[in-house]
Amino acid sequence: AYNLAIPEIVMYNPLIKTIAPAGAASEPRDPITEAQQRWIRETPHTAQRAAMLLLYSGLRRSEATALTWADIDLDDATITVSKGYDFRAKKVKIPKTPAGVRVVSIPKVLVDYLRTQQDGCLYVLHNPKGRQMTEQGWKRLWESYMRDLNVKYGYDGQQNKNRPGGLPMLIDTFTPHQLRHTFCTLMYFAGVDVMTARDQMGHKDISVTLGIYTALDKKFKKKKINRLDTYLKKSCANSG
């Protein structure tokens, strides 16, 4: 597997606040910020394993739900994706397109984390009984996760998340799908070519990947030109 270097980068704030149910309208695809990535890495929670997996592999939530430890080769730093969980039918299904079946290379930060997480259960992500996560299970898990992050980073740990009436959200929350999109964005900044990114993400049509890369190109075009100016300035100075 190739070495997937994932840098920490500052990205624009997410807008979405909750998990969209399966089959609902598409969620906004804003990547999460560098600070939010750090929250995921540094905050122990039952949902941390799911968040780390989605953020640093780009798997779909359905793919992550169906994932078993046998699908992960930590020595080779790869995940074999061959199935997904249908939340409506409540059963595992094969991907809708050949592109969905793939081997995903994962960065060292995820490999090292997963080495500490093997717990003897069949599924990588599971409920307290060791079974696959349901839609409701995901919803409860993620709501709890956002509440904990809100207490720690919004209130500096000075409030009780179970306070009667609840706590207003002071942080920008994010969804599992945003973590998948963030992984694609990280690949862009790491210089991963669009064909490799398409394979990693399991996009049926490369135009989807190209659309993401093109949008990022437009957003950061000025910064690239500034780097060119800096390079040319140094080059001209050295030749003079």
Name each region found by the language model:
Residues 5-14, 73-77, 114-116, 121, ...:
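Proline-centered turn/helix-capping motifs that create local helix->coil transitions or kinks
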Residues 10-67, 75:
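Basic, Lys/Arg- and aromatic-enriched nucleic-acid-binding interface segment
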Residues 23-24, 31, 85, 111, ...:
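Catalytic-site neighborhood detector that most strongly recognizes the C-terminal catalytic loop/helix
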Residues 39-47, 57, 104, 119-123, ...:
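Short, basic (Lys/Arg/His-rich) helix/loop patches that form interaction surfaces
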Residues 71-78, 173, 192-214:
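Short, polar N-cap/turn motifs at the start of nucleic acid-interacting alpha helices
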Residues 76, 89-91, 95-101, 105-110, ...:
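C-terminal secondary-structure termini that scaffold catalytic or DNA-interacting sites
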